[in-house]
Amino acid sequence: ESIVFKNSQLGRNILGDAERLQEYTTENALRFVANNYSTDRILFFSVGNIPFKKVMRLAEKYFGDVAAKYSTKKREKSALYVPDHVRKNLNTHQTHALIGARAYSLSDERRLPLYLLNNILGGPGMNSKLNLAVREKRGLAYTVESAYTAYSDDGLINIYFGTEHDDTEKCLHVIYKELKNLREREMP
């Protein structure tokens, strides 16, 4: 996210960084809650064998006096995506690689076929195209998977793999070949 959504809210670490955490005060926290938490963003869940009327009584008891407040705050639109390449040398015996790009938002109708395509490409099954091509057929990676996340106004699709350092380029070659096949061949 920090690369694909560089210089936007989606690209920021939700945990913060050491410098910002040192500067964070109670006043900052209260201001954040006031600016970001409103009644139009509240979801209430009840799980278990509790009668609906009892749940409603409890909700009314604890939330009935909460004044209605509607947020006008909108997330900043992400900047134009500029492809980038970041390499970090960590003193490990493996390469952990992540390939990502912007994708369709929750409101885009093309997200549904992309969810399906993501499952075919590198979804949770052992029979995904990437798992079969990279791991099972060639034994190049410990793990390989893809993920698609749709946000309200943007999206992210990525492919992750873990491999020996010497096999990184081979993995990339096979992954790019599978992506090309998906793009150029008709699906059965």
Where on the chain are the PLM-derived regions?
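Flexible, small-/acidic-enriched active-site or ligand-binding loops
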Residues: 84
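Acidic/histidine-rich
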Residues: 110
